Amino acid sequence: MNIKQEDDHHHSHAHGDNHCHCGHDQEKAADAIVRDPICGMTVDPQAGKPSLGHGGRIYHFCSEHCRTKFAAAPEDYLTAKDPVCGMSVDRSTARYFLKAEGEKFYFCSAACQAKFEADPAAYRDGQRPTAKPAPKGTLYTCPMHPEVVSDRPGDCPKCGMALEPMGIPPTDEGPNPELVDFVRRLWVSAILALPLLALGMGPMLGLPLREAIGEPQATFIELLLATPVVLWAALPFFRRAWASVVNRSPNMWTLIGLGVGTAYLYSVVATLAPGIFPMSFRGHGAAVPVYFEAAAVIVALVFVGQVLELKARERTGSAIRALLDLAPKTARRIDAEGNESDVPVDDINVADRLRVRPGERVPVDGSVLEGQSTVDESMISGEPLPVEKSKGDPLTGGTINKNGTFVMSAEKVGADTVLSRIVDMVAKAQRSRAPIQGAVDRVSAVFVPAVVAVALLAFLAWAAIGPEPRMANGLLAAVAVLIIACPCALGLATPMSIMIATGRGAGEGVLIKDAEALERFSKGDTLIVDKTGTLTEGKPKLTDIAAFGRVGEDRLLSLAASLERGSEHPLAEAIVSGAEERGVPFVEVTGFEAKTGKGVQGIADGTMVALGNSAMLADLGIDPAALSEKTEALRGDGKTVMFVVFDGALAGLVAVADRIKPTTAAAIQALHDSGLKIIMATGDNERTARAVAKSLGIDEVRADVLPEGKKALIDELRSKGAIIAMAGDGVNDAPALAAADVGIAMGTGADVAMESAGITLVKGDLTGIVRARRLAEATMRNIRQNLGFAFGYNALGVPVAAGVLYPILGLLLSPMIAAAAMSLSSVSVISNALRLRFAKL
């Protein structure tokens, strides 16, 4: 397909309608495009061309014919649909426009235009479906500048790169059009650069090509070969360079644009008008040297780096796509008449009844209404054994039904499901910024101006005191300095590591909310953990009953268990289960009241019953001394004791034990080895807590801690200079998770706990914390290595390119070698970041 791009190079910079919230003006009035809405030609409003007012605006036309056509049906020519993203584009101000096979196409951004140019047939002829428009409310961000956020697609105003959608990506997005386009441009530039290299470097390699062809003819051939590379293949680079200048955000594209543009324009003038150059520009034989091969090879090598970067970024999304693939695409819905039909999962509503057959994935979160089965929940819990499910049991979308059929009720759908929240968390984390990036940004802000200054100084120094041809050598040194300096490596150092680390973490059940959590956890020195559910199984069992006075054990357990049926605490469930196993009857309870961190009370079978810990007894003014010996013995065995009070008098106690998880001891040792001090903060009494802590080697115990006491503990430790990570799983833990330097939500837990935490573990045990710690340390180590590569490379490369080694070794770096080194620096950073995919967690 023949594509004709309209000549708007002098206008090509970041899309002015992008609504980016980054503090930069999107366009200046002087740069506004005025386009004939009929034929698409650009029009100078001051040139006296025909114009027409409509809808409060003035439209300008290239000719009276176009004006007449517009006047007949103006509404038909006001806007056009972007064939790539489907957005409506104002035809009279469209910045991006081209013609293909006689048709006119308008685009909202350079990114959409590049996608169209990469595969016009896909968007023009409808040979395959175009990408679905992003969901309403989708925000877009720059992969290199995550602080840039836009409410529509387009180009980054800082660097000109295509903005990418934030949040959950589509699962059927297909190949990245930008990658397809860049690969095509790479092939063209590489194929044309090879003969340029042969012509330009032939004399150094003993190839008499220039002599055989003739110097003037060889130079014109170089001009013909280099022009498509610079003016077509490198066009995206120049657009980004122009965007950086217009928006006063100098970056790597500024340097590349200056370097390639300078080498090419100088060579064109040297070819077409060599007589204007003085002797200081002329080499052997009084010929003016040209650098077409340098310009073309630089472009090809930059494309190598860009293609590798795009492929690496594409691979980092594989973790998200793997999670998305866990969700089924359809579900079997049962209507009010009992008829069943397959519907897209997106069409499921809360309270819908769904049938799940053996081997199918549970479509959304909900609970069992009818039937029973076993469900593989390993994607959430990490446990390999299927879990039995019957009426009333909860279900998580994406888990696999093994051997039975059941009917479920949908309770959480769409973005509210556990799986969707996990995917959204991973996607946002990959776009987040680590605090260390702030230091990099401050360096980058002065880096590009400093490099331009060094290039200018290098040129002046060579021109003043360099050997002949000193002006040509000065130009060579200046171009080499511009090209070798690579802020790209600096820009990639942190984001690439964060993207890969968050994806790797998701695959290991460690969900990172943002990059700051990783950096803080790597520096943390103190970890606060709860006992129940974190160190222990979280499934306590009733072990002992001790009645006091004339109250029988069955009566004691009956009233205590009846009261606890109103509580959701794991210890309450243990007492209720124990009563059911013993066949003790339950009675009616009224006036139930829960005392946070203390216990419960209410009226059971006409008796005022209270059940709780020592704090509950203190509130009631009851002395537990009569049962102190029994209490201490049970606590010494690591059991949790709860006192039972009937009508204001001590009636007895019940004891519950929670088995320590098999993985806990090894995990605590691993956390100790990583330099963490471990503090157990629990609502249990001192004796029980210390018994558990001693068996596990925990450093410090804080017992009888109420939920609000955990936040006070964090404040106390922080005042001593500690960097604190806090692990919790419930609503009561949310304030402490938010107050800690790093909050760690254990298991899928409560929604508010996940929102308050920087890290969420899909499996609620210490092994997940070990993985998170290792991931955090590996990520920060990787970032420091990347920054070392980037800073070290520039510290060495820029002086060498400027020519500091020439007086010693007679070495003047070619811009081609500089471009190769620049690409190598980016490749080294990307390759090093990719090692995180294989880090031992």
Curated annotation (Swiss-Prot):
InterPro entries: ATPase_P-typ_cyto_dom_N, ATPase_P-typ_P_site, ATPase_P-typ_TM_dom_sf, ATPase_P-typ_transduc_dom_A_sf, Ferritin-like_SF, HAD-like_sf, HAD_sf, HMBD. One of its GO terms (molecular function) is copper ion binding. Pfam families: E1-E2_ATPase, HMBD, Hydrolase, YHS. The keyword Transport applies. PROSITE patterns: ATPASE_E1_E2. Its EC number is 7.2.2.9. Induction: Transcriptionally regulated by HmrR in response to Cu(+) ions. SUPFAM superfamilies: Calcium ATPase, transduction domain A, Calcium ATPase, transmembrane domain M, Ferritin-like, HAD-like. The chain crosses the membrane at residues 186-206, 218-238, 256-276, 285-305, 445-465, 474-494, 602-622, 638-658, 742-762, 800-820. Signal peptide: none annotated. Mg(2+) binds at D729, D733. GO terms for biological process: copper ion homeostasis. Keywords: ATP-binding, Cell membrane, Copper, Copper transport, Ion transport, Magnesium, Membrane, Metal-binding, Nucleotide-binding, Phosphoprotein, Translocase, Transmembrane, Transmembrane helix, Transport. The active site is at D530. GO terms for cellular component: plasma membrane. It catalyses: Cu(2+)(in) + ATP + H2O = Cu(2+)(out) + ADP + phosphate + H(+). It is found in: Cell membrane. It is a multi-pass membrane protein. Its main location: membrane. Involved in copper efflux. Belongs to the cation transport ATPase (P-type) (TC 3.A.3) family. Type IB subfamily. This is Copper-transporting P-type ATPase. The lineage of its organism: Bacteria, Pseudomonadati, Pseudomonadota, Alphaproteobacteria, Hyphomicrobiales.
